């Protein structure tokens, strides 16, 4: 116990001190750990925010990369499509050229005959092309092996030829025709099926493809269509004023032979072939010709019991008929009468009206710079004589220089009836005015009041005042003084140069004045004062129109016949007009000429 017990407590204390030291070390370590943990806990929110920011940045970058990837993918797709398109274009450009041909006929074994490159070939047809629907003359496409791979349309370009006659068809072949080219050579051609359903007549213009020998289309000849105006005029005899005697003459000449052909045959009377209407300009020659066609159509339809009146009025524009090429004018004349014969063959009355007849059918040998009338006149004569066998065609010519028309045309048997359309006198002027001044027009209240508000009396008074103003031989109406070859002199008044066209123009002027007055003042209606002023304006406007350079020619056109006029002097005062002139050379003519 002595020495052993003495060492025991020391050892215990030493051990306890070591334990305490170890515990203190652990406590110190734990305290450091606690401090570290506390610092980490304090710093964790900031790190969390930093991580969240990094995460958001990563997500944004991922979205940007995804969008960029989509754009790159689209660009790659476009590049691939473009490569495919370019490859197709290269393949297409590398294909051999396709040829064209004209289908001629088909065979039972499925092959067809085509015309291509100046050769006639028998070729096969692609299954994509229906052989049965191919038409004669149709254009087809050929591949490199000369097989038909596609059906096309019909040719639309070529030479223009004139049909002479249709030939007898040959079984299994396209119809044929005889045509005349521009150099008058004749050629036999085939008709394409595009023409087989159209009525063709001699003289038609056709489109020819010269290499294949097919005609494809009927071409309207514009120059002929413009010259010939087919129409049923709506002008009635009741629309014409002041020409009752001339209308009666022309009705006797035209309507009687058409309506009573049996009586003409019984009396062995040949109906007239033609009528010449001559007289000063603007007096109704063309108007009468149109009324003839209209009246004739109504009468014939009434006799036949047909409901609708039908006739043809072939209005030939004289100067436009002329053509600078030799033979063209004669061809136009032949076509005109051919058209007339075709229409007359249907049992329909046909009026062939030549306006300004003196411009194309002058006396042969009277031409100054050409002798074109030497062939045109005989052509017309032969056509008129050819009309003899037709029952429904009559020729009407109009001219204000009948002295210049070739006498062979005017002789009996051609233009049998000659009717002069004279200038209207006072009575005729009243009749003409009544066609344009009607009771349906707006009339001024003051003028109505002067005639007891009677519209008929007001219009009648207007017409009477206007006629008196125009036809009075007063000082203000003096127009010209003419000197004849025998030395006599005569004063001509405006009434000596009136025409139906001039009377209509006066009424139109008055109506225009009434309209302007209505727009300016609000008070409307036609007044007699408007008509008086219109007369003055019409006279003044035409003061300088008479051609005093060649009085004799002027007199013929104006309708003044008899003693030869050698001198004309105008009597218009206040205009500073020159005195008259003797015969020199003709210049421009005006309305009066």
Curated annotation (Swiss-Prot):
GO process terms (BP): modification-dependent protein catabolic process; proteasomal protein catabolic process
Keyword terms: ATP-binding, Chaperone, Coiled coil, Nucleotide-binding, Proteasome
Family: Belongs to the AAA ATPase family.
Family matches, as SUPFAM superfamilies: P-loop containing nucleoside triphosphate hydrolases
Pathway: Protein degradation; proteasomal Pup-dependent pathway
Annotated GO MF terms: ATP binding; ATP hydrolysis activity
Binding site for ATP: 282-287
NCBIfam families xrefs: pup_AAA (TIGR03689)
Region annotated Docks into pockets in the proteasome alpha-ring, chain positions: 592-593
Disulfide bond residue pairs: none
Xref: InterPro entries: AAA+_ATPase (IPR003593), AAA_ATPase_domain (IPR050168), ATPase_AAA_core (IPR003959), ATPase_AAA_CS (IPR003960), NA-bd_OB-fold (IPR012340), P-loop_NTPase (IPR027417), Prot_ATP_ID_OB_2nd (IPR032501), Prot_ATP_ID_OB_N (IPR041626)
Function according to Swiss-Prot or TrEMBL: ATPase which is responsible for recognizing, binding, unfolding and translocation of pupylated proteins into the bacterial 20S proteasome core particle. May be essential for opening the gate of the 20S proteasome via an interaction with its C-terminus, thereby allowing substrate entry and access to the site of proteolysis. Thus, the C-termini of the proteasomal ATPase may function like a 'key in a lock' to induce gate opening and therefore regulate proteolysis.
Superkingdom, taxonomy of origin: Bacteria
HAMAP family referenced in this protein's UniProt entry, alphabetically: ARC_ATPase (MF_02112)
Assembly description: Homohexamer. Assembles into a hexameric ring structure that caps the 20S proteasome core. Strongly interacts with the prokaryotic ubiquitin-like protein Pup through a hydrophobic interface; the interacting region of ARC lies in its N-terminal coiled-coil domain. There is one Pup binding site per ARC hexamer ring. Upon ATP-binding, the C-terminus of ARC interacts with the alpha-rings of the proteasome core, possibly by binding to the intersubunit pockets.
Sections of the chain in a coiled coil: 23-95
Protein's recorded name: Proteasome-associated ATPase
Annotated GO CC locations: proteasome complex
This protein's domain notes: Consists of three main regions, an N-terminal coiled-coil domain that binds to protein Pup and functions as a docking station, an interdomain involved in ARC hexamerization, and a C-terminal ATPase domain of the AAA type.
């Amino acid at each position: 116990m002595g020495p052993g017990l003495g060492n025991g407590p020391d050892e215990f204390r030493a051990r306890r001190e070591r334990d305490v030291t170890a515990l203190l070390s652990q406590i110190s370590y734990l305290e450091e750990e606690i401090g570290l943990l506390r610092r980490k806990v304090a710093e964790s929110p900031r790190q969390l925010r930093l991580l969240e920011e990094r995460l958001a940045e990563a997500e944004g970058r991922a979205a940007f990369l995804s969008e960029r990837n989509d754009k790159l993918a689209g660009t790659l797709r476009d590049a691939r499509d473009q490569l495919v398109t370019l490859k197709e274009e290269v393949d297409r450009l590398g294909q051999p050229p396709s040829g064209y041909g004209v289908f001629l006929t088909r065979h039972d074994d499925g092959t067809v005959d085509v015309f291509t490159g100046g050769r006639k070939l028998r070729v096969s047809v692609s299954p994509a092309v229906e052989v049965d629907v191919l038409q004669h003359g149709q254009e087809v496409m050929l591949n490199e092996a000369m097989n038909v791979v596609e059906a096309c349309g019909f040719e639309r370009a070529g030479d223009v030829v004139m049909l002479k006659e249709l030939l007898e068809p040959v079984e299994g072949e396209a119809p044929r025709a005889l045509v005349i080219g521009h150099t008058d050579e004749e050629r036999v051609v085939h008709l394409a099926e595009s023409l087989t359903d159209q009525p063709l007549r001699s003289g038609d213009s056709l489109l020819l493809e010269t290499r294949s020998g097919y005609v494809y289309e009927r071409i309207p000849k514009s120059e002929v269509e413009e010259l010939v105006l087919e129409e049923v005029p709506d002008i009635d005899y009741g629309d014409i004023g002041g020409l009752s005697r001339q209308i009666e003459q022309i009705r006797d000449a035209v309507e009687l032979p058409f309506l009573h052909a049996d009586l003409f045959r019984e009396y062995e009377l040949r109906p007239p072939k033609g009528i010449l209407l001559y007289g000063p300009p603007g007096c109704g020659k063309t108007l009468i010709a149109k009324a003839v066609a209209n009246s004739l159509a109504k009468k014939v339809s009434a006799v036949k019991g047909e409901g609708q009146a039908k006739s043809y009025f072939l209005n030939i524009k004289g100067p436009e008929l002329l053509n600078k090429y030799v033979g063209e004018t004669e061809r136009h004349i032949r076509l005109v009468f051919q058209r007339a014969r075709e229409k007359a063959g249907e049992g329909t009355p046909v009026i062939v009206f030549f306006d300004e007849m003196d411009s194309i059918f002058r006396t042969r040998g009277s031409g100054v710079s050409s002798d074109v009338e030497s062939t045109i006149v005989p052509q017309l004569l032969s056509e008129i004589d050819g009309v003899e066998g037709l029952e429904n065609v009559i020729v009407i010519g109009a001219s204000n220089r009948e002295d210049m028309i070739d006498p062979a045309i005017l002789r009996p048997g051609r233009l049998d009836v000659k009717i002069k359309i004279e200038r209207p006198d006072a009575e005729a002027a009243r009749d003409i005015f009544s066609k344009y001044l009607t009771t349906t027009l707006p009339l001024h209240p003051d003028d109505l009041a002067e005639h007891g508000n009677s519209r008929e009396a007001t219009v009648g008074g207007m017409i009477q005042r206007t006629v008196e103003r125009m036809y009075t031989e007063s000082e203000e109406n003096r127009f010209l003084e003419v000197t004849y070859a025998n030395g006599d002199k005569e004063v001509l008044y405006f009434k000596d140069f009136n025409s139906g066209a001039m009377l209509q123009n006066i009424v139109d002027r008055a109506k225009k004045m009434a309209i302007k007055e209505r727009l300016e003042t609000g008070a409307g209606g036609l007044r007699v004062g408007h008509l008086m002023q219109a007369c003055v304006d019409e006279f003044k406007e035409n003061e300088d129109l008479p051609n005093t350079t060649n009085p004799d020619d002027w007199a013929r056109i104006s309708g003044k016949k008899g003693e030869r006029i050698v001198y004309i002097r105008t009597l218009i005062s206040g205009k500073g007009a020159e005195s008259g002139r003797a015969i020199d050379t003709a210049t421009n003519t005006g309305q009066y000429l």
